[in-house]
Amino acid sequence: MKFIYALILCLAALAVPAFAQEKPADTNMQILLDKVKADKKLVVAANMDLTEPEGKTFWPIYDEYQKELQSINDRLVKMILAYADVYNKNALTDAGAKQLTNEALAIDRDELRLRNIYTARIERFLPAKKVARYLQIENKIRAAIRYELATGIPLVP
């Protein structure tokens, strides 16, 4: 469980400084992202109790899912940075707010679509209880990260 908290703090640290500085240190951010990905996989592994045959089928699917999820995460970071830019300049227009809202909703839709696709794939190889457990782990991690991000991102003025 300590891994989850460390993971959350690391991810939250990535987005929130955007409201305080002009340019993030890309190298440091990439190192942090790589560490977070590795720690997340450790959290999942420690909590799934997979047999060897289950692991052989689960982990390749997990890795594919995380790779596709990364593109959604990249969009989320891009959206947060765009908001940070206009927020810091006090330049958010109604049109800009609508664009941010539409992108946020599209990100949520795409994440749900991806989760449904990969849940169906995992269900072919794991018992339903383990599928549910994995979804709980994934959802708790993502919810905690979103919460931490939300606490650091100011409301639209």
Name each model-derived stretch:
Residues 16-20:
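Sec/Tat signal peptide C-region and signal peptidase I cleavage site
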Residues 21-27:
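Charged, compositionally biased N-terminal leader segments and the immediate start
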Residues 28-31, 35, 112-157:
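Amphipathic, charged alpha-helical segments and their helix-to-coil junctions
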Residues 38:
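Active-site-adjacent substrate/metal-binding segments within catalytic domains
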Residues 2, 78-80, 137-142:
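N-terminal hydrophobic signal/anchor transmembrane helix of membrane proteins
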Residues 1-4, 21:
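Positively charged n-region of N-terminal signal peptides that target proteins for export
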Residues 5-15:
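Bacterial N-terminal signal peptides
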Residues 29-30, 43-125:
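Amphipathic alpha-helical segments
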